[in-house]
Amino acid sequence: MKSWSGSILNDSTKSLANKPHPIRGYAYIAAATFMWGIAATLGRAAFTGGLLSSGKALQPIDPLILSQSRTTISFLVLLPILWARRGSANLRLPAVDFGRIVLLGVLGVAASNYFYYLSIQRTNVATAIILQYTAPVLVLLYMVARGFQRPTLQRITAVGLAGVGSALAIGIAGPGGFRLDALGVGAAILAAVSFAFYNVAGHQILARYDRWIVLLYTTFSAGVFWLIVNPPWKLVAAHYSGLQWEFLLVFAFVSVLAPFSFYFAGLQHLEPTRAIVASCLEPVFSIVLAALLLGESLRSIQALGIVIVLVAIVIVQLPERAGGEVTVVEPIE
């Protein structure tokens, strides 16, 4: 925690001409997806009552409350730290940029979570994740349509392999793999759009502000969104114990504060297509950790999917031909 808070103290909202470093970008994205993999394993245990305290199982935590609390708690933790170290004046944003970051928090972070959980409720985890990980295709299409990138064979291959690998890793080829439901499928597609949006919009806003400012206002706007969807009295009515709230505090750090700070840092060093292909490591880590920690089986088809995702990441990070576009921002560390 000390080193994490120390990095906040050294951040500055002023642009510094730091050269983008792709290796650091991939390391940041990998760290973020690893944390999300841990969060997925913890979340699964929380949903099913698999959390233990002093040898006793804690009562299951509602997925909606788990998603809501992690953004709200993250904002409440981050705000006083930044306020104390930077002062209120350095936390203010122009109205236009404030609006953009609010949209990033609501349409990107909060909406992707909301539609993802709605899709799980209406279909299953495999269907939700498989459709959500069509987001790399959406990002590539957007970047090409706007003229930011060319549709090279390298990019198309990497995006295609990332999608196929994620589908196999999640278990689309297994029993109960893909389940159709109009509302559930629609929600999963909207989750993919939201995921793609916060990769592209996040990359753009990080050209002007450091990751901590972006994280502060995205968690704020996402928290407000969740308060509308799930009002405070519903939280009170859940009657969670002190141990459950302690878990929610830890979960906020593992699922939002740490991984989003890493992911936003990665977006400062990588253009959105490469970043979102690398993000396909998340289901890989989730599956491996679930196998190691929860005893879930890892089938050969899932192992093949993991290998394909890794191949996609290797392909997307290969150097482009001379004259390729440069769409990374100058990192504000």
Q: Which residue ranges define each predicted feature?
A:
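Helix-helix packing/entry segments at the starts of transmembrane helices
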Residues: 69, 109, 113, 128-134, ...
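Hydrophobic alpha-helical transmembrane segments of multi-pass integral membrane proteins
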Residues: 23-31, 35, 60-84, 100-103, ...
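Membrane-interface helix termini and inter-helical loops of multi-pass transporters
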Residues: 41-58, 89-91, 121, 170-181, ...
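Hydrophobic/aromatic residues within transmembrane alpha-helices
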Residues: 46, 66, 70, 119, ...
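Glycine-/small-residue-enriched transmembrane alpha-helix faces in small-molecule transporters
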Residues: 1-65, 177-204, 329-333
